[in-house]
Amino acid sequence: MIPSQFYGFLHLQHREFSAVNVSVGSFRQKIRTYLRNADILSRSLEAHGHAFHLLTNNSNLIQRFSPRISERLSISEIEFSTPVPTGVRFFSSHYKLDALRYLGNEQNDYAALIDLDMLCINTAPEALLEAERSGQALYYDITDQVVPSAGEEPLRAQLEEILGRPVDLQWSGGEFLAGPPAYFRALAEAVEQIYQRYIDVSVGRYRVGNEPYQNAAIEILRHNGWNIADAGPMGVVARYWNMPVKHNQPPFRAFRDKFLVHLPVDKHVLNLMRTLSPSRPESFLTLYAATKWLWLPLEVLNRLWGKLGSVRIRR
């Protein structure tokens, strides 16, 4: 038994350039970057026997800008109704609440909601299979990664202001949640309780995006008796920064046995991998290891491309 349903979401809105950890020069380039990431993620999951579905607010725009990817991906257009302040950083990531609502109302026995800049590089570990069998709710704890860069006290203060009570700081990454529909439904309901408070407290003062309100919601669920396990030690998911970082990150060889790896700064590397059309299960890990060193040249090239608006890469 494997979690047969993996979901990602892509909210599109012109003039709200919500690209994260990547240089893009236009709305069109943003769409194509994230769609190519979704495509290589989908291929890697399919190579290991999993299905991937992309949730979006504008399937017509996806079809217009990337018709081939639109045909290949399983895409569902859903309602995105979360009120998001215009101009806020990470604008589109706020709509994760709508993806939580959607999965809370689905009939899947078990599903995972993941970021698009990820790869499936191994067979699902037994711990994930057991989590599905038992209906275990999962998240990914990145406290040891985020505290060195953001500081423990600002993170704790933000959550305590949102929730109105003291908390034991455990910070989850936005790239991975898995569980039965009841878990996603409970998360959505918890976010709805504190969302406006999150906006009032955070905009202009603290971190913004889906991570802060997701963490507040998980804290509410724990307070209400939910048992939510960390998928990181299970080997289910890991975040690898392909650049110097403030936390103690091991070399990439320590990530080779993970099921899913999140690659926040490697969006252009993932796009390059897609052009090479890997298909065998083992080829995704091999190809990433061979091309990961290109992240900086690709980032610089795409930044120049975005500024000039006329640069074209010729094969």
Place the predicted regions along the sequence by residue.
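N-terminal anchoring/stem segment of glycosyltransferases
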Residues: 1-84, 107, 289-315
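Hydrophobic anchor at the start of a short beta-strand
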Residues: 51-53, 111, 225-228
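Active-site donor-binding segments of glycosyltransferases and PAPS-dependent sulfotransferases
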Residues: 58-96, 247-251, 255, 265-283
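Short beta-strand-to-loop acidic/aromatic patch adjacent to the donor-nucleotide binding site
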Residues: 100, 108-119
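Conserved donor-nucleotide/metal-binding helix-loop-beta segment in metal-dependent transferases, i.e.
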Residues: 120-157
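Short, flexible, basic/aromatic active-site loop/helix in glycosyltransferases
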Residues: 154-168
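Catalytic core and acceptor-binding pocket of nucleotide-sugar-dependent glycosyltransferases
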Residues: 166-260
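Long, low-complexity C-terminal extensions of enzymes
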Residues: 244-315
